[in-house]
């Protein structure tokens, strides 16, 4: 009986050791990231009395996925399984542009959804991201076409923003910060058109 007891005890120790080994070899947990309005954007000293609805926003199929896609070389990209967007990237971009415009225009009437409950006519902003390249520790490059549709039958206003923001450091936090600044540059171009006489 003593020999049997020792065998069982030895087997138990082996099982515990194996479980510990497997736990140590398990895949790392994914981390989730969100975009934010650029914290260097200052609120307009004079408000622009305008209601704006941001959307739709389109992005390239390459980056339209939960994983953050980074560029390895001219013809190679990396789909980062353990670095993911907390929300669909299109939704993140539209919300950040709307938040940037609220600050830049000094208007709280900038949304991503038109409820139709406001009597003030809305200006509609469509943004088509033609390319979005992320080079870790180097730069985020963005090429965006945007169209402002005024209320009524006024002609649309079209523009293009080509932006390159340096990634100041290693890691995904630095990458996200560069995305935020790139979107702020796009928002700044849109806000300028909304403020000009031809844009209002």
Residue ranges of each PLM-predicted region?
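Short secondary-structure boundary motifs at beta->alpha junctions and helix caps
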Residues: 77-86, 152-188, 192, 199
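C-terminal motif of bacterial Sec signal peptides marking the signal peptidase cleavage site
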Residues: 21-24
């Amino acid at each position: 009986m003593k020999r049997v007891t020792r065998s069982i005890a030895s087997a138990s120790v082996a099982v515990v050791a194996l479980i510990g080994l497997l736990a140590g070899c398990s895949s790392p947990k994914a981390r989730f990231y969100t975009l934010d309005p650029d914290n260097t954007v200052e609120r307009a000293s004079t408000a622009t009395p305008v209601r704006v609805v941001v959307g739709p926003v389109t992005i390239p199929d390459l980056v339209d996925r939960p994983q953050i896609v980074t560029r390895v070389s001219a013809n190679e990209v990396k789909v980062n399984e353990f670095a993911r967007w907390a929300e669909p990237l299109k939704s993140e971009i539209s919300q950040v542009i709307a938040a940037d415009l609220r600050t830049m225009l000094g208007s709280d009437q900038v949304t991503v959804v038109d409820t139709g409950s406001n009597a003030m006519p809305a200006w509609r902003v469509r943004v088509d991201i033609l390319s979005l390249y992320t080079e870790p520790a180097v730069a985020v490059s963005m090429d965006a076409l945007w169209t402002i549709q005024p209320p009524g039958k006024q002609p649309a206003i079209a523009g293009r923003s080509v932006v390159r923001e340096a990634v100041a450091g290693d890691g995904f936090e630095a990458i996200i910060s560069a995305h935020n600044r790139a979107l702020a540059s796009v928002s700044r171009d849109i806000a300028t058109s909304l403020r000009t006489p031809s844009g209002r």
